[in-house]
Amino acid sequence: SARIAPKMEAYIFPGQGIQQKGMGMAAYASSAAARKVWERADAYTRKELGFSILQVVRDNPKELLVHGSPQVHEKGVIHLTQFTQVAMAVLSQAHVAQLREAGRLNPDAVVCGHSVGEYNAIGALGDVLPLETIVRTVYERGCEMHRLVERDARGESGYRMGVIRPHYAGLTEADADALVDAIAKETGEPLQIVNYNIKGRQYSVVGKIAAIGVLKERLE
């Protein structure tokens, strides 16, 4: 006889990078539970933070005034980390509310998050912190991250993020580390592996645009 292990379900909350205009708005239109989350968050961001998270997600304006200070990004302000992180937090809680509303939320599922997704996992399924606290926390986190890097008039910084796929390039982890270190020394520009996401398969890299460009050339 054979034994079949029970199916395991997991709810995984991602970090930044998947944000886009209109995300979550289909659920906003079709799910009362999701809409309630978005409207609760929007009321809080309007009153306490000086902007509308619904406006950010729906319209993705290239410029937004927050307490009289212009926030600018040529691809839309949803790509500024302080707004990205709030949008991701609200989206996560809205998705969970929609699942719960439909009776499809598994209380025995594994829950995890990556980077800002850790906060969202705690907020959406951990029953540890209320929505408003999560929104405030990730907004302040994003503001600090934003302030750490100089930006031009378009809201762009001189830094970029990339991904190394070592198994595609025939590299070991040590090879990848050495390559990144060598390029940083050659260019005199910051370049560093910041997350070893999947061993031997996916590493996140950040650095100045010139150094990222050299890394791309070496891997092609």
Residue ranges and their predicted role:
Residues 124-220:
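Alpha/beta catalytic cores of group-transfer enzymes, especially the acyltransferase/condensing modules
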